Every structure is written in structure tokens, then in C-alpha cells.
Amino acid sequence: MAITDWPIEERPREKLLNRGAHALSDAELLAIFLRTGVKGKSAVDLARELLAYFGGLRPLLEASQQDFCQAQGLGNAKFSQLQAVLEMSRRHLAAALEQKTSLTSTTAVKQFVSAQLRHRQSEVFALILLNTQNQLIKFVELFNGTIDSASVYPREVVKTALSHNAAAVILAHNHPSGIAEPSEPDKAITKRLQQALQLVDIRTLDHLVVGDTEAVSFAERGWI
């Protein structure tokens, strides 16, 4: 049955307008993004099949261009639209963070860092640079690859912080394995960076390790 034959209140677009996006299922939200189905399938039917094919909404959103475009009903145009939506979401979080008078909420910082790093396929080490009022100056990605004491250079971290006149920093990196629990090398490099930054009077407020479903805070663990 075509969606146009459904009761008006059950059609995804009308349901969203009347009840809010939160009231829709993953399949209904995806159907609105798809706009149309394929021969013999409504947009909602196609959306359900795609969610089953990818294993859920998140794997679909994080799929590579090649994997995404191989699925029925998808292609480069939809992939481009999706990437634009995801990037707007990340920029929205960044803008919201910039507007805060100070970054005193670990939850807000976790949400921002997770949006930036959780989807990355390789490890990325980044800095959140803050001024004397703990306001955001800039989010900077510094290193890519295996993050350990041999690949993260304290000199580059200090240089970047000084070049932006940062008074404090929050360290962040992701674990592509999906497990956010910090490793011993994570703890070792945090200590090295904290010591290097102290030499130039720059405070290290936290180190966040991002996994699939959570971000672990060194500060909350009492390690900083």
C-alpha cells in the first residue's frame, strides 16, 4: 500500500508535523529522508529493509560511500544529502558549545566530541582550546592513526595551544574499536601532555576517550 493511501495521521511527514520528530520510528524518519520508495515498496517499507540491511540506523549513517550506494534505493545523491545533514548537525553542536559562557558541563563537551569523532574509522587526536573563562576558542584535530606516546608529540600540542593563546585545553581522541575504556598508553600520553602544558602555564582540564556508545572522562575518573 502506498503511503498516500494511509490515514493522514499515520503518514510519516504529517505525523512529524503534528506530533514532533521524536514520535517517529527510525524507519519513519528514514522514509522522510528517502522521500519515495521503489517499485512495489513504499518509502517506509524500503526504510525498514535498509535498516535491516545495515543493522540499524547508526551503521547506515556511518556507512562508507561505497557501502551506502550499493544498497537499493540509495546512491551518490542521497549520500551527499546525508553527509550534508550530518555535518550541519556537527556544526550545530559546535555553535551551541561556542555560545556557552564557559564549558563547565562535561555532558555538553562529551556530546560535542562524540559527534566529531565517534564516526571516524581511524584514531584521531584532537584539542579543545579554551580561553581564561573556559570559553571555546577552537576545536583542532592534530594527529591521525594509532594514538600512543610515539605518535602524539607534546611539542606540537603545546605549539598549537600557544598559537591560539589558549589558557586551558581538553584533550580528546576516539577508539575505533568502539570501546571507550582508556588504555594504559592513553593514561601515559595524558600525563606527558599535562606536564608539557604545565611548563607554559596551560591547564589540562580533561581527556575524553570516545567509543561507540559513551565517552569516558579522565576528570570524572579523578585522573586529572
From Swiss-Prot:
GO terms for biological process: proteolysis. A motif (JAMM motif) lies at residues 173-186. The keyword Secreted does not apply. Residues 102-224 form the MPN domain. Zn(2+) binds at residues 173, 175, 186. Keywords: Hydrolase, Metal-binding, Metalloprotease, Protease, Zinc. InterPro entries: MPN (IPR037518), RadC_JAB (IPR025657), RuvA_2-like (IPR010994), UPF0758 (IPR001405), UPF0758_CS (IPR020891), UPF0758_N (IPR046778). GO terms for molecular function: metal ion binding; metallopeptidase activity. It comes from the Bacteria. Belongs to the UPF0758 family. This is UPF0758 protein Sde_3678.
